[in-house]
A protein has these predicted regions:
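Hydrophobic helical h-region of N-terminal Sec-dependent signal peptides
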Residues: 10-15
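C-terminal motif of bacterial Sec signal peptides marking the signal peptidase cleavage site
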Residues: 16-21
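A residue-level marker of the well-folded mature domains of exported/periplasmic proteins
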Residues: 2-6, 22-363
Length: 363
C-alpha cells in the first residue's frame, strides 16, 4: 500500500497536488460529471497538447486525429509549443467553437483553472490527459498511466541494474527529475524515492553532489540540453576520479542526454533509467547502454481516452478506475489509470511484441 499521506505533503508544498487515500477503487463507472444527456455523434472535440518534446506526444496527435475521424467527430488537435498563454488561448478558442469535450495535456497544470471553468460553464466536459490539471474544480476526468508506479519501477530498475553490475554497494548515484511545471514530475520523483530513500538512509546509495531534493534536481522544460549541462557540471565537480554507478532519469530524452555527458567525460556509462520507449533509447538499451525505459503505450492511452469520449457521447459516465488518489488541490478527480511496464534488454522483445515499430528495433 502506498505511503500516500507522506507524498501528499510533499506534493502540496511544491504544486498543491496531493495523492490522498490509500488504495484503489476498481469500479468501471466512476463519479465523473458532465454530459449526462450525451451529444451528437458528429460533435466538435478539442484536443490541446503541450509540445512535441518526445515521440509519445507526436504519436498522440496522429492517433487522436485518426480516432476522432473514424468515430465521426469533428476534431481539432493543437500543440501549444510549451507556451502557457498559447494553450490558454487555444482552449478558449475550442470553447468558442462549441467543443463538447476538451482533452488537455497541460503545459502547466497550475495555469488552466480559468479556462477549465469557462469550458464547464459552456457545457463542455474536461478530461486531463497524462498530466493532472491542478486547482481546478471543474476538471471532470483524468486519464493517464499510473505515474507513481512509473517512479517506483524506475527506482527499482536502478537498484536492480547496479546490483547486476556490482553485487554490493555502496553505489554512487545522481538524481534527475522532470520539469517543475509538469504535475507528473513530482509524482515520478516521489514514486522513485519511495524505493530509493531507504537505501540512501542506510548508506547503500551515495549522492556525491548532495542534490537529492526535488527542487534541486528538476530539468526545466524537460529539455535535453538542460539535463546535459547539469550532468556535465556533476561529472566535473564530483566524478573526476570517483565512479558513477547509476542515474535516475525520469524519461528517455534526459537519459540519453546524461549518457552523452558521461561519455564525453570519458567515463563508463552507468545504469540509467528512462521512460517513454523512444526508438533511440530502445536501440541504446539493446546496445547495452541505457539500462531501462518504461512502456507507456500511447496507443492504449489514446484508445482509453477515445472510449471515454464514446461513453460521454452516449450520455454515459466515462470509465474510472480510481476515485481516491488524485486530489488536484480542490477536488479528487476521477481517474482512469493504465498500468506501466518496465522494459530492459531482458524483456524488450516480449514488451514490444505488438508494437509495429519497436518490435523491429528489438530483433
Amino acid at each position: 500500500m502506498r505511503r500516500i499521506t507522506k507524498i501528499a505533503v510533499a506534493l502540496t508544498a511544491v504544486s498543491t497536488l496531493a495523492l490522498t487515500g490509500c488504495g484503489r477503487s476498481d469500479s468501471d463507472n466512476g463519479s465523473g460529471s458532465g454530459s449526462a444527456s450525451g451529444f451528437a455523434a458528429d460533435s466538435y472535440i478539442g484536443i490541446a497538447l503541450p509540445q512535441k518534446t518526445s515521440e509519445n506526444w507526436s504519436l498522440a496527435e496522429q492517433l487522436f486525429k485518426d480516432g476522432l475521424s473514424k468515430a465521426g467527430f469533428k476534431s481539432d488537435v493543437q500543440f501549444a509549443n510549451n507556451g502557457v498563454s498559447e494553450q490558454q488561448n487555444q482552449i478558449q478558442t475550442m470553447i468558442t467553437k462549441g467543443a463538447k469535450v476538451i482533452v488537455i495535456g497541460a503545459v502547466d497544470g497550475g495555469q488552466l483553472s480559468s479556462q477549465v471553468k469557462a469550458a464547464h460553464d459552456a457545457g463542455a466536459v474536461v478530461i486531463a490527459y497524462d498530466r493532472l490539471i491542478l486547482n481546478a474544480q471543474d476538471v471532470d476526468y483524468y486519464v493517464a498511466f499510473d505515474n507513481f508506479k512509473v517512479g517506483q519501477l524506475q527506482g527499482q530498475a536502478l537498484l536492480d541494474g547496479m546490483h547486476a553490475k556490482k553485487e554490493n554497494g555502496p553505489y554512487n548515484v545522481e538524481l534527475f527529475a522532470g520539469s517543475a511545471d509538469d504535475s507528473n514530475s513530482k509524482v515520478f520523483f516521489e514514486g522513485a524515492m519511495s524505493v530509493l530513500k531507504p537505501k540512501i538512509d542506510d548508506g547503500t546509495l551515495k549522492i556525491a553532489s548532495g542534490q537529492k531534493d526535488f527542487s534541486q534536481v528538476t530539468t526545466q522544460g524537460w529539455k535535453a540540453e538542460n539535463a546535459q549541462k547539469r550532468m556535465d557540471a556533476l561529472m566535473t565537480s564530483n566524478y573526476s576520479s570517483a565512479t558513477l554507478d547509476g542515474i535516475l532519469s525520469p524519461n528517455d530524452t534526459l537519459a540519453r542526454a546524461a549518457i552523452t555527458s558521461v561519455k564525453a567525460a570519458n567515463k563508463p556509462v552507468p545504469v540509467v533509467t528512462g521512460q517513454d520507449s523512444e526508438v533511440e533509447s530502445v536501440k541504446s538499451i539493446m546496445a547495452g547502454e541505457q539500462y531501462s525505459t518504461i512502456n507507456k503505450d500511447t496507443r492504449k492511452l489514446v484508445e482509453a481516452t477515445m472510449d471515454m469520449l464514446t461513453s460521454l457521447q452516449k450520455g454515459q459516465k466515462a470509465k474510472v478506475t480510481d476515485e481516491k488518489q488524485y486530489n488536484n488541490g480542490v477536488k479528487v478527480v476521477p481517474a482512469n489509470l493504465l498500468e506501466p511496464v518496465i522494459v530492459t534488454k531482458a524483456n524488450a522483445r516480449e514488451a514490444y511484441s505488438n508494437d509495429p515499430t519497436l518490435s523491429k528495433v528489438v530483433q
